């Protein structure tokens, strides 16, 4: 007994030593290529499940499932892995991988690389190439048969990728023929999606089919988007036709589903490769009477009537017992005429009305009774800008348009009033007309977009700003040239001389805008992916190319140059003490308003902005800039007209106020240098009818809209007190001295003749003469203020 036990122990020990010292267990590396991620709950999920089950059954430590899409991706990823030489089997599950895998198999055939490729499709097998296929037509036929039995509305819908992967719509036909065979009264509608995996189109197309009254909708796609849409719409007729056991996930919401069992195909192939077999064959998967090797699994809801199940299984048993090439979708009364019409080849025995096996996947055109709805395209939804904001901007702009028109009328009505005449009515109306154009442009900018409005808004706004700013600048250049004239040279500047300069500004603008329009390709486009739009939403926007953008920047630089000129002119005329002409403060305030807007707008525009927000900011900024400019320039003028009446006098510009230190110092200097009141007492004190400026100098003049000239009487000498500004503004010219031919006698502020200094008697005479001149100025002012001008 002890001997027997000892012998058994020795035998077991010997076996253990033999196994431990023997050849190590053969390693096996498996790679499976997927066309999409496993989350699709469809074809790729089931392929991955087959890969995992094979790895578990064979206890593989080195197996990978890799997602690759298309030929290039397959070559790029797979070729380096195969070149290492340690990959035993590559499963190319999709037809997307087929060409690349076949090329690699051909490349390494007969080489030291022992990798074998299991490729989906047909063709001759080689020592390192195994092909496989499965009866997809059979699965679709029997699914259609169930749909025909179960439908209540007799309307069935279907979705397919369409004419891709050389499949065309042959499987749609198989589904339809199964439904037609079960229920001849059905109506059948189908869309092509264009891809095996496009959930957005699938959902939208399914909804369309439901709206048409279809209660059964199936597909040949890789996911369950169709079924999910039916479930979301409270339909209890979802069908799982993607090869995934959908009922395992959705339960009774799915009425019927079939699933692939890839393990039953992959495992025997992997075992064959593992054993070293190179005598490869083609593999084919289908329903089988032997359930242990049947590729398809079926599942039904408990709500399916027994009568329906009975008819279904009767048809399925018929398919299992009938050779595949004699199945109803190959052989029927419709096939002969269809093949003849579409140039397909029938089988050798035409009397059977069976299509040749190689011709089945060429079926694409619909059979009589199939309604093809075309290639489905999702209808994009247009997103409009906020209607209330659009109405608000348009209403405000319209109000200011009316206001500007009223102002233009008032300028014409009160053109003789010194408050208006001194600012040149023609240029005031130019400024208002520019504002009017901008307001119209803002209305177009805020309205619906088309190619015409895209161009119109840029033209109107740029021309408006050029007219407004150009007129303001040119008008004040005249004041600068007149008063920046220390030598009292003759200066003649008429409106006819100034208006062309505004025209020059406009011509430059027109040239730049013409370039933008011609080369900028400024047009309306339907933009997607902006302003947090949905995937299938769009917004109309104006778009230009890079050349147009460069031109637009040039236009902006041009506007900046005009503004800088305006700043310069404003600074230069600040010294003009005649308030009728000194608009430097108004111009400065206008420029401050524009600058304020720029400081606010530029950071906002640089930061990421929605197109709608950008449009609103630009429109509001335009309204603010133009309105501020108009109010700053015109409100003081109309206010003076209102206070002093429609006639008005030049006195409206002068207010009693404390003299500036400079003016006080000059007045004191004048008093000390004169003997008794002279020019100092008569001029600096601003006696009755005589006005003084900030410097204490005499000011006299009549102001019209377009000319400036000195006071003089024909054929008489003109005596001018040094430091006094003498100007009469008529309709013809603007000059410091009209009668240049007459002798000019200059009298200094000290009352001394420039040709005879230090003569006290002459000083007294000059002071008396200075007072006489002041009286003449006073009388002339009264006469001119009562004299209506034409402009």
From Swiss-Prot:
The chain crosses the membrane at residues 391-411, 425-445, 454-474, 496-516, 551-571, 586-606, 616-636. Residues 23-390, 446-453, 517-550, 607-615 are extracellular. GO terms for molecular function: G protein-coupled receptor activity; G protein-coupled receptor binding. One of its GO terms (cellular component) is G protein-coupled receptor complex. GO terms for biological process: biological process involved in interaction with symbiont; detection of cell density; G protein-coupled receptor signaling pathway; negative regulation of asexual reproduction; polyphosphate-mediated signaling; response to bacterium. Residues 749-760 have a biased composition (Low complexity). In the N-terminal section; belongs to the BMP lipoprotein family. PANTHER family: METABOTROPIC GLUTAMATE RECEPTOR-LIKE PROTEIN C-RELATED (PTHR46924:SF3), METABOTROPIC GLUTAMATE RECEPTOR-LIKE PROTEIN C-RELATED-RELATED (PTHR46924). This is Metabotropic glutamate receptor-like protein D.
């Amino acid at each position: 007994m002890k001997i027997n036990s000892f012998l058994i122990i020795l035998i077991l020990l010997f076996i253990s030593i033999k196994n431990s010292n023997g050849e190590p267990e053969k390693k096996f590396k498996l790679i499976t290529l997927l066309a999409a991620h496993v989350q699709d709950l469809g074809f790729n999920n089931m392929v991955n499940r087959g890969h995992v089950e094979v790895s578990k059954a064979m206890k593989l430590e080195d197996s990978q499932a890799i997602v690759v899409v298309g030929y290039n991706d397959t070559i790029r990823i797979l070729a380096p892995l195969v070149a290492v030489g340690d990959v035993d089997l590559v499963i190319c599950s999709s037809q997307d991988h087929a060409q690349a895998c076949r090329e690699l198999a051909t490349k390494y055939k007969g080489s030291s690389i022992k990798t074998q490729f299991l490729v989906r499709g047909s063709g001759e097998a080689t020592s390192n190439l195994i092909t496989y296929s499965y009866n997809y037509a059979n699965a679709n036929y029997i699914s259609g048969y169930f749909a025909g039995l179960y439908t209540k509305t007799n309307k069935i819908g279907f979705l397919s990728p369409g004419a891709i992967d050389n499949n065309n719509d042959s499987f749609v036909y198989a589904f339809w023929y199964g439904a037609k065979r079960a229920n001849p009264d059905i109506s059948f509608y189908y869309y092509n999606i264009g891809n095996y995996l496009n959930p957005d189109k699938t959902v939208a197309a399914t909804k369309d089919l439901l709206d048409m009254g279809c209660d059964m909708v199936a597909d040949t796609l890789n996911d369950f988007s169709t079924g999910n849409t039916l479930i979301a719409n409270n339909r209890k007729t979802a069908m799982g036709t993607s090869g995934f056991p959908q009922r395992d996930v959705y339960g009774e919401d799915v009425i019927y589903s079939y699933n692939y069992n890839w393990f039953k195909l992959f495992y025997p192939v992997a075992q064959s490769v593992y054993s070293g077999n190179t005598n490869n064959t083609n593999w084919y998967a289908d329903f089988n009477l032997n359930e242990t090797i049947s590729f398809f699994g079926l599942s039904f809801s408990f709500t399916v009537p027994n009568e329906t199940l009975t008819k279904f299984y009767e048809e399925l048993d018929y398919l299992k017992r009938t050779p595949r090439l004699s199945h109803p979708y190959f052989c029927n009364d419709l096939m002969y005429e269809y093949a003849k019409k579409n140039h397909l080849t029938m089988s050798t025995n035409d009397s059977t009305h069976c299509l040749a096996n190689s011709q089945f996947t060429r079926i694409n055109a619909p059979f009589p009774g199939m309604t093809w709805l075309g290639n489905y395209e999702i209808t994009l939804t247009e997103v409009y800008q906020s209607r209330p904001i659009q109405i608000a901007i348009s209403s405000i702009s319209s109000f200011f348009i009316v206001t500007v028109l009223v102002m233009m009328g008032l300028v014409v009505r009160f053109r003789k009033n010194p408050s208006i005449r001194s600012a040149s009515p023609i240029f005031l109306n130019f400024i208002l007309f520019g504002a009017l154009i901008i307001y119209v442009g803002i209305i177009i900018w805020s309205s619906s977009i088309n190619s015409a409005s895209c161009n119109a808004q840029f033209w109107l706004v740029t021309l408006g700003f050029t007219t407004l700013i150009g007129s303001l600048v040119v008008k004040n250049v005249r004041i600068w040239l007149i008063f920046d004239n220390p030598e009292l040279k003759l200066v003649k500047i008429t409106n006819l001389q100034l208006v062309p300069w505004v025209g020059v500004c406009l011509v430059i603008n027109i040239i730049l805008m013409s370039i933008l329009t011609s080369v900028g390709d400024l047009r309306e486009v339907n933009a997607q992916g902006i302003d947090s739009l949905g995937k299938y939403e769009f917004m109309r926007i104006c778009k230009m190319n890079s050349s147009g953008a460069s031109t637009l920047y040039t236009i902006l630089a041009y506007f900046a140059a005009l503004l800088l000129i305006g700043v310069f002119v404003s600074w230069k005329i600040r010294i003009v003490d005649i308030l009728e002409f000194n608009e430097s403060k108004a111009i400065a305030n206008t420029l401050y308003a524009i600058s304020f807007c720029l400081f606010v707008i530029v950071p906002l525009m640089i930061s990421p902005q929605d197109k709608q927000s950008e449009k609103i900011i630009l429109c509001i900024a335009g309204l603010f800039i133009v309105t501020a400019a108009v109010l700053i320039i015109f409100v003081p003028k109309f206010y003076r007209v209102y206070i002093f009446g429609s006639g008005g006098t030049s006195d409206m510009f002068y207010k009693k106020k404390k003299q500036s230190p400079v003016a006080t110092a000059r007045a004191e200097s004048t008093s000390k240098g004169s003997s008794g009141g002279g020019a100092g007492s008569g001029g600096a004190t601003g006696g009755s009818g005589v006005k003084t400026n900030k410097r204490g100098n005499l000011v006299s003049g009549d102001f019209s809209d377009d000319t400036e000239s000195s006071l003089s009487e024909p054929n008489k000498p003109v005596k001018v007190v040094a430091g006094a500004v003498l100007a009469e503004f008529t309709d013809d010219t603007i000059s410091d001295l009209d009668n240049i031919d007459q002798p000019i006698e200059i009298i200094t502020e000290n009352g001394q003749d420039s040709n005879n200094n230090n003569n006290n008697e002459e000083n007294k005479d000059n002071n008396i003469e200075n007072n006489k001149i002041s009286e003449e100025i006073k009388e002339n002012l009264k006469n001119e203020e009562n004299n209506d001008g034409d402009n």
